[in-house]
Swiss-Prot record:
S-adenosyl-L-methionine binds at E44, D69, D96, D118. This is tRNA (guanine-N(7)-)-methyltransferase. It catalyses: guanosine(46) in tRNA + S-adenosyl-L-methionine = N(7)-methylguanosine(46) in tRNA + S-adenosyl-L-homocysteine. One of its GO terms (cellular component) is tRNA methyltransferase complex. The active site is at D118. It comes from Streptococcus pneumoniae serotype 4 (strain ATCC BAA-334 / TIGR4). The gene is trmB. Pathway: tRNA modification; N(7)-methylguanine-tRNA biosynthesis.
Length: 211
């Protein structure tokens, strides 16, 4: 999600350290201390403008959520939503999520969300897809044994690729939805992209994969 630079984004992020972790490298292995409890920690990579991560935090007060995005302006809009929701169980990171081992200890998080990731449709860009095997290597490290990835996309090609990638990696597919919004799945929290795509009648795909 590319957005225009937002004036004052840096100042807004820096003014809210209760939600924005300003020194993420120092947070490694200390996330439960930062949240002040031992509740499960769920991470969304590429949290965009924050509709999903803030909605999940409000819906599940006994789970801690971390939203990650590389774009400062985007994350500042996510912070707007977090401030609006006003719940304590959420943190935001302005970092590149390509190597999460920089910010999380082995087994430190309990679930990972990949929502509407860039599909990188060209074959030569396969290694940039977040469900490529090298990313799965990283995700497996920071998740516990039997940790899960919950994945949503509107891109059929990326969905099919990811199913194959998960399976070839040896992961167990605990749930596959070929049309999420037409299913009986309960508790779905939509991202901004998801709302936009669903309003246009596009099918949303979902999978839960376990290491």
């Amino acid at each position: 999600m590319r957005v225009r630079n937002r004036k004052g984004a840096t100042e807004l992020l820096e003014a809210n350290p209760q939600y924005v972790v300003l020194n993420p490298l120092e947070a490694k292995a200390k996330w439960r201390d930062l949240f002040g409890n031992d509740n499960p920690i769920h991470v969304e990579v590429g949290s965009g403008k924050g509709a999903f991560v803030s909605g999940m935090a409000k819906q599940n007060p006994d789970i801690n959520y971390i939203g990650i995005d590389i774009q400062k302006s985007v994350l500042s809009y996510a912070l707007d939503k977090v401030l609006e929701v006003g719940v304590p169980n959420i943190k935001l990171l302005w970092v590149d999520g390509s190597d999460l081992t920089d910010y999380f200890e082995d087994g430190e998080i309990d679930r990972l969300y990949l929502n509407f990731s860039d599909p990188w449709p060209k074959k030569r860009h396969e290694k940039r897809r977040l469900t490529y095997k090298t990313f799965l290597d990283t995700f497996k490290r920071i998740l516990p044994e039997n940790g899960e990835i919950h994945f949503k996309t509107d891109n059929r090609g990326l969905f099919e690729y990811s199913l194959v990638s998960f399976s070839q990696y040896g992961m167990k597919l605990n749930g596959v939805w070929l049309d999420l919004h037409a299913s009986d799945f309960e508790g779905n929290v939509m991202t901004e992209y998801e709302q936009k795509f669903s309003n246009k009648g596009q099918v949303i795909y979902r999978v839960e994969a376990e290491f």
